[in-house]
């Protein structure tokens, strides 16, 4: 089994749970524009938010307007408080390729920016999705492991499990730091395409996000049983 099949099988088994298991609160306080978010659950509302912010981004006439949207999505919605103004301005002024060329540096932030700049093309890469992709490869003992850079998480379970599997993960084949994000996008899109039923790469991203703790613990237990 390869990584794509492992993720595809996981997605087939769990895509029906996405509306109930994906949880991320939306607080529109401090949002510089007025939006009416629709949806019956957290998943639908967050998808709607992403695309409405994209529309507002396209309608923005000035750098300041674009900056305020990107800052809100990273800082307020995403809860990433570590970026200074200069960094957020860089994420606003840079082209998508310039951001991708930064590699893993700041990816949990700049991939959020890309996901509203062009949600048709891009998706978020953060500590939870990184853990899930690596965990699935351990759980299913895929034929050719691919290294996806682990990131520091605010979640204690994910950080603990990351430490338990890091020796194994570090041995895997590594893409160039400037290339793995595109590999990640391609993987999500291929799985969504094979899944059918109008699934998108955002759905696969959100599945990985939602199941991160469960997959992390399964991978850590699997790894410990092999030791």
Residue ranges and their predicted role:
Residues 78-83, 121, 137, 212-216:
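Short alpha-helix boundary/capping elements
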Residues 41-44, 48, 65, 104, ...:
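Alpha-helix boundary/N-cap detector
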Residues 62, 101-102, 117-121, 172, ...:
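Conserved aromatic-histidine-acidic binding/catalytic patches
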Residues 7-99:
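Long, highly charged, low-complexity intrinsically disordered interaction regions
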Residues 1-29, 127-132, 140-227:
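C-terminal accessory module of base-excision DNA glycosylases/AP lyases that mediates lesion recognition
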Residues 115-128, 135-141:
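Catalytic Zn2+-binding segment of zinc metalloproteases
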Residues 88-94, 100-101, 146, 150, ...:
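Catalytic cores of nucleic-acid editing and processing enzymes
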Residues 94-118:
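Helix-hairpin-helix
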């Amino acid at each position: 089994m390869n990584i794509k099949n492992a993720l595809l099988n996981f997605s087939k088994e769990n895509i029906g749970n996405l509306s109930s298991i994906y949880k991320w609160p939306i607080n529109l306080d401090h949002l510089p524009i007025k939006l009416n978010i629709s949806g019956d659950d957290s998943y639908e509302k967050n998808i709607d938010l992403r695309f409405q912010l994209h529309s507002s981004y396209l309608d923005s006439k000035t750098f300041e307007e674009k900056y305020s949207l990107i800052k809100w999505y990273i800082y307020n919605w995403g809860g990433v408080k570590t970026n200074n103004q200069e960094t957020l301005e860089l994420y606003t002024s840079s082209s998508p390729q310039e951001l991708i060329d930064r590699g893993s540096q700041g990816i949990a932030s700049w991939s959020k920016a890309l996901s509203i700049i062009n949600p048709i093309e891009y998706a978020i890469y953060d500590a939870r999705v990184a853990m899930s992709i690596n965990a699935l490869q351990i759980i299913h003992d895929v034929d050719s492991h691919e290294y996806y850079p682990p990131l520091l998480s605010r979640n204690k379970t994910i950080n603990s499990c990351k430490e338990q599997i890091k020796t194994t993960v570090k041995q895997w084949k590594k893409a160039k730091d400037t290339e793995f994000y595109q590999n990640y996008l391609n993987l999500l899109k291929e799985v969504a395409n094979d899944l059918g039923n109008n699934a998108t790469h955002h759905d696969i991203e959100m599945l990985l996000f939602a199941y991160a703790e469960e997959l992390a613990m399964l991978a850590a237990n699997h790894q410990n049983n092999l030791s």
